[in-house]
Design a protein with these regions (language model features):
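Bacterial N-terminal signal peptides that target proteins for export
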Residues: 3-16
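Sec/Tat signal peptide C-region and signal peptidase I cleavage site
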Residues: 26-30
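Small-residue-enriched, tightly packed secondary-structure blocks
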Residues: 31-242
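Residue-level detector of alpha-helix boundary/anchor positions
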Residues: 1-4, 68
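Bacterial N-terminal signal peptides
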Residues: 15-23
Length: 242
């Protein structure tokens, strides 16, 4: 009888411990996600701000003709040069693809590697990538994507030169730009590696980057967390196919 009582007590104690563990896990998980969401909302805002500042200088901005042809746009704000030198991830950013009537929720990516000879001495640099066709975008949705590998990459033209825009379109699937110390220009980023930050994508959306940016995934703005909407909304102000 006593052994039975002891056994029951042990079972009850174990059940109590498991209940407490589950309670703490239930509380900790939403808190962790809220922190991630806040960080990604800030990242989306920085990307949107950088893009806005670039486009607000028409004579030195991305040509409208190219912007309107882009299938997806990536912005990596405030990338630290030192991160590339030591081989670590240089920075984080967001990618949205064009969808009917606007742009998709931003998926989160890392950027690193490559040759950045023109940026020696720069503390922080904003990078903008235009994916000019679905083939280039599909390459991005792999686990790791190297610019200049399967998809050709070229320094994008700036300003109002339509002729330059047309010529570049014939040569590259991806156009790359950089802004450092207020100077915005095309920069060829061959060898740069971009990979999805799926820990953050899952924390914010519950799915990975390739699902977020899939052409078959139907999103509405109401399904997108409010904090990260600023990036697709900013892109829509400058380019929306009607």
């Amino acid at each position: 009888m006593r052994s039975t009582i002891k056994y029951v007590r042990k079972i009850m104690q174990l059940a109590s411990v498991l209940t407490l563990i589950l309670m703490f896990a239930t509380v900790a998980w939403p808190q962790k996600n809220q922190k991630k969401l806040a960080a990604k909302a800030e990242e989306s805002k920085k990307a949107a701000d950088a893009f806005t500042e670039i486009m607000n200088v028409p004579d030195k901005a991305i040509p409208q003709s190219l912007l309107d042809k882009a299938e997806a746009i990536a912005v990596f704000p405030g990338v630290i040069k030192g991160g590339f030198i030591v081989g670590a991830r240089g920075g984080h950013g967001v990618v949205s693809r064009r969808v009917p009537g606007g742009w998709s929720p931003p998926a989160f990516f890392n950027i690193g590697g490559g040759s950045f000879g023109l940026l020696i001495g720069a503390e922080k640099t904003d990078f903008v990538l235009l994916f000019m066709n679905t083939g280039a975008l599909e390459g991005l949705l792999k686990d790791k994507f190297e610019l200049g590998g399967e998809a050709g990459v070229a320094a994008g033209p700036v300003g109002r030169s339509t002729a330059a825009s047309t010529d570049v379109l014939l040569k590259a699937q991806i156009l790359s730009y950089s802004r450092s110390k207020g100077v915005f220009a095309g920069l060829e980023l061959k060898g740069t590696v971009i990979d999805p930050d799926n820990d953050d994508n899952v924390a914010v959306y519950g799915i990975k980057a390739n699902e977020i940016l899939s052409s078959g995934h139907k999103w509405t703005m109401s399904q997108t967390p409010a904090g990260v909407r600023i990036f697709p909304q900013t892109l829509a102000r400058y380019s929306t196919r009607r």
